[in-house]
Amino acid sequence: MSVWAIGDLQGCYDITQRLLEKINFDPAQDTLWFCGDLVNRGGQSLETLRLVHSLRAHSVVVLGNHDLSLLAIGARSEEEQRKVNPDLLRIVMAEDRDALLDWLRMQKLAHVDRTLGWMMIHAGLAPKWTTQMAEKHAREVEQQLQGGGYRKLLRNMYGDQPGWSPGLSGYDRSRAIINLFTRMRYCTPRGRIATDDKGTPGTQAQGLYPWFEVPGRVERDLKIVCGHWSALGLTITQGVHAIDTGAVWGGKLTALQLDSEELRVVQVPGREVTGPAPVARAPRRPRERQGRQRSRGNRGNAGNAAAGPKPSVDTPQD
């Protein structure tokens, strides 16, 4: 039995299949940990989501910022859904969209296996969060996503503010937690995220640190595997194992074996970026489904009017 963590797929279905072949993945005995951002930009997001969904009995998934954006898109009106890029549009118009999105909404922000000694997140942790605190805060938001009021959470999750504080409440608290788990790269020693700095360490503004190198951060009792930061490349430092190696940008897709005495890294080449992503043309919604989908979309749209302006639905926050 092997446990493999895999970096950001971002809709690169063919590349994901090649990586699974290279690690000799056997669903009868192996387990996959997906570090989030299953979808968007790679051109094969529907196929990728279906693949991971089909492996749900043999895998663990944490949500990334692109996954949450897909859920937000799926909860909006049909008119708004049609504004997204064709890669994501194919998902929200697919016959099995409800099964895929309902399953995705049930996934975690953080996964912990204390027997194995690992925690998986998508992006980062607040400097003062222990793994126990991180797990507790992740469960807060997961319960909201998995509950009946999830549409309201998805409408209110966008924005860079406020920074994390233990005294936050309501959607401000949920937003701050989501931003830490799914958008973090650099931050201040007090844990305030710098969303505009996305390059390699050394290029950031003064006073900012990679989240895993912040002075005064707490010592953590688990090794951490994460994705999100493709510019960082494969990085193993301070107990953190960052494995988003930019498959969607022409880099590599990386798998890291978590249950071996010596860390084993397996990679395959990423997507060719000389041309457009290999996305199929977005299908028309079947005529017999239009009434039901429009009705569901209108219910969601009633709440959108009070939510104020939102970011473009085809530009997930990084």
UniProtKB/Swiss-Prot annotation:
For bias kind Basic residues, which ranges apply?
Answer: 282-297
Q: What is its EC number?
A: 3.6.1.41
The enzyme class is: hydrolase
Presence of keyword Hydrolase: yes
Q: Where is the composition biased (Low complexity)?
A: 298-311
Key words, A-Z: Hydrolase
Region (Disordered) residue ranges read: 269-318
Record-linked SUPFAM superfamilies? Metallo-dependent phosphatases
Single GO MF descriptor: bis(5'-nucleosyl)-tetraphosphatase (symmetrical) activity
The catalytic activity, as recorded, is:
P(1),P(4)-bis(5'-adenosyl) tetraphosphate + H2O = 2 ADP + 2 H(+)
Describe the family membership recorded for this protein in Swiss-Prot or TrEMBL: Belongs to the Ap4A hydrolase family.
Q: What does this protein do?
A: Hydrolyzes diadenosine 5',5'''-P1,P4-tetraphosphate to yield ADP.
Can you name this protein? Answer: Bis(5'-nucleosyl)-tetraphosphatase, symmetrical
Report the source organism: Xanthomonas euvesicatoria pv. vesicatoria (strain 85-10) (Xanthomonas campestris pv. vesicatoria)
Point out the gene that encodes the protein: apaH
